[in-house]
Structure formats: C-alpha cells, structure tokens
Amino acid sequence: MEGRVSEETRGEKIGRRLKTVPTRFIGLLVVTVLFPVLLVAALVTDVVRALTAHRPFMATRLLLIGWIYLAGEVVCIAAFALTWLFTIGPRRAERLERSAWNIQQRWAPSLFRPLCTLFRLRFTIEGADQAEPGPVLVFIRHASIIDNLLPSVVVAGPHELNLRYLIKRELRNDPGLDIGGDRLRNYFVR
C-alpha cells in the first residue's frame, strides 16, 4: 500500500501469524467440542452465584460470547484467506482493501449485536448525521472491548466510510485485527 512504512519484516509478520492464527482455530474446536460440559459448568456456577450472592448469570453469557468471538475470528480469517487467494489482477491491493472493509462490516455487528442482547446493553446515537459526507475524525475512548466495535457499527457501516484506525501494536496478536488492519491501511502504534 502506498506511503506505508512497516517496522517489521515480512518474515516477522508471517512468523506472528503462524503463531496466532492456529490458536483461533484450535480454540474454536476445543470450545465447540467441550461446549456441553462448559455450559453445564457455567450454569452451575451461575445458579450457585445467583442463590448465594444474588448475582446475575454471568458465566453462561461469557461462554456464549467467547464462542461467538472465536467463531467470528475463524470466519474472518477464512474470508481473508479466500479473498487473498482469489483476488488477482492489476488492482489487487484496492480490491483486497475493499473486501477487508466488507468483512469488517459483517464481523463487527456479528459481535456487537450478541453482546448487546446477552448483556442487555442499549445505545442511543446522537448526531450520527454529522459523519456524512466525510472526511471525519472519530475519537473513541477505549474503556472496554466493546469500544473497538463502535466506530465500525455506528459510523463506518451506516455511512459507508472507510475509517483508518490507530491501533495498539499489541492487538496484532488478534489475527483478525492484524490481517484486516493491514489491508485497511490502519496504523499499529507502540
């Protein structure tokens, strides 16, 4: 991509992805196979907590969100791999970027909606019309994991804006963010 300088070599990037990508596939496989046992354990934990400490069911919801996250990561990684394999031609970089944006616009709501449903979260968006037609600067204060999804769900998707992100370099350990982030010309910072 034009104008980008990477602080890592191609070998370092491939090495990192050889470590991080399999963890998502193995994680999804393990959680899926053990899901019945994990669900019973989560339900027992939640019932005991509800009866003794009057706490809401949290373990069950976290298990469900964990599985949804892993499934979403695996689907994204597979989609990135397929688009990389089948996107050829003179405008390959541009088409890979567009496909990554489309993948992101399906991934973010696929995590955001279940989070909102399971944790009964409600959001009110004021001034959303201010994002059009762009250019626009969006500042999101990172206080929780959900905050990572908000720009895509609230601004980029509804207004079809291809946002660029400044992302903590440590988030390259999430292969979906790593691969998609590179294709969307985001900047990973220290």
Name every feature range the model reports, one short phrase each:
Residues 1-133:
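Membrane-proximal helical "anchor" segments flanking the first transmembrane region
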Residues 80-110, 117, 132, 136-190:
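Catalytic core of membrane glycerolipid acyltransferases/transacylases, capturing the structured
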